[in-house]
């Protein structure tokens, strides 16, 4: 990417990391996934992936690096990538607000939650079997739903304004 685009990506990563940090006291209620989705929608799949992976990596300097970090990077990056592939060309703020919020909930529960629940089994068990995966998915479901609800709320609050600003930046700096 061009230097102009890298600056915008760095700003979005910073927003995502700060947003996770600000809500540290509320378990699983984080706006970071919403920022990643908005990045993918506003700047395309490549930037969505980069913002997702870099945000997970950088925020873990505050919350702690561990064997889960690459899994978080992969999960967040995947959400940003898919968001860009699905919405970046056909996004209309007036018509797409609710579908993007529903999509954000599904991303938190199915994609991010599914990858992280799978990661917990693979990281912490020597005897991998379907029972462990089932237990991980069932026990992780309430956590994923809370994360999904927070993603809906933050997408509802932020998507229109942030995407409008990203579109303005894209035009102004020919990104």
Name every feature range the model reports, one short phrase each:
Residues 1-38:
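Hydrophobic transmembrane alpha-helices
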